[in-house]
Amino acid sequence: MTTGFAAKDDVFARDILSVAQLNQAVGQLMERSIPPLWVRGEVSNFTQAASGHWYFTLKDAGAAVRTVMFRGRASMVGFVPRPGDEVEIRGRVSLYEPRGDYQLQADAMRRAGVGNLFEAFSRLKDKLASEGLFDASRKRVPLRLPRAIGVVTSLQAAALRDVLSALARRAPQVEIVIYPAPVQGADAASRLAAQVRQASARREVDTLLLVRGGGSIEDLWSFNDEDLARAVADCAIPVISGVGHETDFTIADFVADLRAPTPTAAAELACVPRAELLSALGHAASRLSRAQQRRLDLAAQRLDRASAQLVSPAQRLAHQCERLNTLRHRLAASAQRPLAASAARLTGLAQRLARRAPQTARVQDRVQSLAQRLLRGQQAGLAERGVRLQALAAQLRALDPEHTLARGYAVLRDAQGRVVSNASALVVGEGVRIDLAQGRVQADITDVQPRR
């Protein structure tokens, strides 16, 4: 990457250059000749200025180069490098003209080896995606009102404290089961996968949270493990992941049924706030009360209409007695009519016989005797029918409920207004209504003794 000075270049065509002109020309030459590139080295002499800019030296065993990273780019790195850190920097070579020192002006930084990790991440992501493990059709919706929530994380993790605090605040009634496992380290991924499988096998929780706090890509790498991803995909319980911060994505996030940006957010997604639940229950109770009141009002209206149409037993009895008297008069009248007609015919025959044969006085006497016997028979029959009518009237009065109540009896009705005739139809504590001859009484059943 060598560049010669052109003899006819405007700057170098002059016989004598100032130092500033020289440095400016060299700086322009370097910027044109060397494209942006990646450089790997060790951080030393790191300084973070009050302005937010980073100044440090990037070195290896054989050389060193001054490096600067301005505040806007430094804020996007995601970590603050420390002396001794191996990093990979993307930047361009520039010349600091006041001193004539060349430097590396960085616009991106990552920890050394992150490129390999990202490639491994991408390969695993593509593999699992091709198997359908990320498909939306596989995702399950966590229960809105879980009975118990499981948490897979480290017992020492700040994420666990955040989750417990959020759940205690939002849903103190929910039981919490912790499945402890390290969240970083050599065996973290396998132990996390084992706890997910254990929670799936036990089925003692309704929702499972897989959480840890933020960190570097190396700190979060356990959650990019294939075995853990398959354990989450095979879990019989809906899984909510909350790993790192909002900008962090892991393979576990893609496989989980629901991804939360933080552990606290995962806890919030796992349950409905108690206040919201109580409010919803209050609204539901109000709607139920209004609906029940409407039903009671309609039932009361129907009862009023039915009561208006219902004839009391006394009225029914009076109506029947009136009808009975009418029938009795009609019966008496119908019995007298044929009797009077027969007597008139006999009298007419007797008169005709008397005119034609005075000697038939004996026959006339006999006819009169028969007429009297017929009259007595008709009267006896009428009397017998009158006695039967009186007996029927007495029976009708005996069956009158008002008459029965007047003798000291009572009618017992249940809460629905039905007449109760069997003690076994009642239960202790049930409300009943007792109808008396004068008024009614409400009572509660304290003892039931069926007839043996």
From Swiss-Prot:
- Which keywords, in A-to-Z order, does the entry hold? Cytoplasm, Exonuclease, Hydrolase, Nuclease
Q: Name one GO biological process term.
A: DNA catabolic process
Looking at the UniProt record for this protein, which Gene Ontology cellular component terms does it annotate, in alphabetical order?
A: cytoplasm; exodeoxyribonuclease VII complex
Q: What class of enzyme is it?
A: hydrolase
Q: Which InterPro entries match?
A: Exonuc_VII_L, Exonuc_VII_lsu_C, OB-fold_nuc-bd_dom
Q: Quaternary structure?
A: Heterooligomer composed of large and small subunits.
This one is known as Exodeoxyribonuclease 7 large subunit
This protein's species is Bordetella avium (strain 197N)
